[in-house]
Amino acid sequence: MYPDKDVIHQFLSLLTEPWKECSPKGQLDLRFLANGKSASTAQFSDDQLMDATDHIVQLNINKLNAYVCINPVAEKPLKAGKGAKDEDILRAHFAFADCDEPGSAERLKSSALPHDFSVVTGTRPHLRCHYYWQFDQPLQNLAKWSVIQAGFAKAYGSDSCVK
């Protein structure tokens, strides 16, 4: 499987579009992982989406999986190899369900409220998707966001670590 640059850019654009209405806008926090390798991280502002896209593509080609923090993080230096922590998150613009377990993607798609967009993260050995719902207004109460995320995990069998 080869990374699709256009799809990656579209995904990053969808995530960061609502940030433009907020102050501070924040930045993207990216993490890259692979078995037997140290974690790698990178941060990009919303006006550096092509740079972020190119970075993701290059590291995917080098067999690292990319993980994007869907919420904007504070614009501050982070320790090398360390991604943003909960206290670095500025606010939430989306709820999402990480459906990587067998049957969870199909279960959510057939019974949840319509999602705003989704990303297929794999098809073998089974369908794996992430589903996204945009809030009408940014959610400042991140404890409430965690409750929403836990609700998705319980109802649909999505990843319970996403909170």
Model-derived regions: residue spans:
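Signature for HUH/AEP ssDNA processing cores
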Residues: 1-129, 133-147
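Flexible helix-coil linker/hinge segments at domain or subdomain boundaries
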Residues: 150-163
